[in-house]
Amino acid sequence: MALVPYTDSGVQSLKRFHDSSASFKFVNHNIEIKQDWKQLGVAAVVWDAALVLCMYLESEGIHLQNSSVIELGAGTGLVGIVAALLGAQVTITDRDLAMEFLRMNVRDNIPKDSLHRVSVRALNWGKSLEEFSTYDFILGADIIYLEETFPDLLQTFLHLSSQQSVILLSSRLRYQRDHDFLEMMKLHFTIADVYYDKNTDVHIFRAQLRQRKEL
């Protein structure tokens, strides 16, 4: 998730994001996520798309036990934390500026005997991808929103995906450009809208690389 600096405009409708922390319960764990809108902006608060994806992972029988998982644009790290609590080996990523913030949330919410299954790494989409391998699951919550990042995000998906990889994208489709990105993905991936939460207007999309004969 891109780091956007704090501005005063429009934040009155986003009062909950100004709380220094947010509490949740997933996988029978009480999770306390620190937030820092003022310093890190949209990357440092919990958005609806992250909550919907966490609920989906827990309630829809997604088998993450011992799977390799990477979260892109992790922001607060909530999705990656829940994936780890579900038994996955998780790499939680965002830009360099978010690293210490992410590590703090991971340390606060992952049991000490499970910390070895979680790594926090900087990943700028489209750059230094050779440092990363493929993963069983690639997760992203509200990462489809800056059009200038779309080519790099698509390149990152392609690098991280094998034929068996599953991408789960949770997003509120606010603008035409969001739909356009999904169309870009369809050139390389099969995509299905697998879940819709009407209360938050958030969709979850499941994507997998097309078989070579389909390209």
Curated annotation (Swiss-Prot):
Read off the Pfam families from this record.
Methyltransf_16
Q: Which UniProt keywords apply?
A: Cytoplasm, Methyltransferase, S-adenosyl-L-methionine, Transferase
The UniProt catalytic activity note for this protein reads:
L-lysyl-[protein] + 3 S-adenosyl-L-methionine = N(6),N(6),N(6)-trimethyl-L-lysyl-[protein] + 3 S-adenosyl-L-homocysteine + 3 H(+)
Quote the cellular component terms of the Gene Ontology held in the record: cytoplasm
Q: What is its main location?
A: cytoplasm
- Its EC number is 2.1.1.-
- Root EC class: transferase
Where found?
A: Cytoplasm
Tagged with keyword Cytoplasm = yes
Functional note:
Protein-lysine methyltransferase that selectively trimethylates residues in heat shock protein 70 (HSP70) family members.
Q: Which family does it belong to?
A: Belongs to the methyltransferase superfamily. METTL21 family.
Q: What is this protein called?
A: Protein N-lysine methyltransferase METTL21A
- Source organism (scientific name): Xenopus tropicalis
